């Protein structure tokens, strides 16, 4: 419930978010089951929308209208391929390999991260990604997020636009677009105080494909 409530807190400050009405933990628990252990607010919405991204060289970016956001590292992980064989491990995901690769390429660790923009088709996806990136140990994601750590004013601002759960569901473009907004310092009311390092993630299949 903490992830759903946190996302909604961020979404109330995002003029582009679809769900901007505050959500309490009591309302979360009172919502109907979709498939246990997932309540209604554990699951993302379905909506129409569009996001555009311009990718170019650092030299060319200096001449463009918007301040550039530099990609320091990237990685991907594919522990399973449902087209070839079933992937039944719902605990370890491609985020572990993708995160290690991206952070190593950038020369940073999780201790250096200012803000996270994570793929969150379900609240569980946020939790397991934080675990696999190394922000906490495996199995400790629930307690890690329970104290408002991801919410406004928390130690690790996460999905600051409301994520896919409360803002808009545009697949991997949701975290990417908000990461760019935060890194540029254009988040307005929801802008993170520190925003030098903002990883974004994307997830595919039943947790078996991940990009960082």
Summary of predicted features, one role per range:
Residues 1-14, 53-59, 167-187:
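Active-site-proximal alpha-helical scaffold in enzymes
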Residues 1-37:
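Glycine-rich, mobile lid/loop segments that gate access to catalytic sites or pores
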Residues 2, 33-97, 101, 147-156, ...:
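Condensing-enzyme catalytic core mediating Claisen C-C bond formation in acyl metabolism
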Residues 74-77, 114-123, 164:
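A short beta-alpha structural unit
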Residues 83-88, 120-143, 154, 206-212:
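Short glycine/threonine-rich loop-to-helix capping motif typified by GTGT followed
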Residues 98-112, 187:
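Phosphate/pyrophosphate-binding loops at sites that engage ATP/ADP/AMP, CoA/4′-phosphopantetheine
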Residues 136-148, 188-193:
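A glycine-biased, small/acidic residue-tolerant capping/turn segment at secondary-structure junctions
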Residues 161-169, 182-186, 190-212:
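Structural signal for terminal/edge beta-strands and the immediately following C-terminal loop/tail
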